[in-house]
A protein has these predicted regions:
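Active-site- and interface-proximal helix/loop "cap" or "latch" segments in soluble metabolic
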Residues: 1-71
């Protein structure tokens, strides 16, 4: 899965797109998190699992957001 995410100088998410994963669910996630603060999204989505997998698309988005904050 590839995640492209951008945020402004106030850590407000401006754009998110995923390559791979469940298209409908990911479109919903993108719309819900756009305009939200990075830390708020991480607090809500970190640690979500997908079935027996240790991670999920929302959890992977959190990892991408954490990397973005480090830039």
């Amino acid at each position: 899965m590839l995640i492209d995410v951008t945020a402004d100088d106030n850590d407000i998410i401006q754009q998110v797109s995923f390559l791979g994963g469940c298209d409908g669910n990911l479109q919903g996630i993108c719309r819900l998190v756009t305009g939200q603060k990075i830390d708020d999204v991480i607090a809500k989505l970190r640690g979500i699992r997908c079935g027996d997998k240790p991670t999920s698309c929302p959890d992977q988005l959190c990892h991408a957001l954490e990397q973005l904050k480090e830039l």
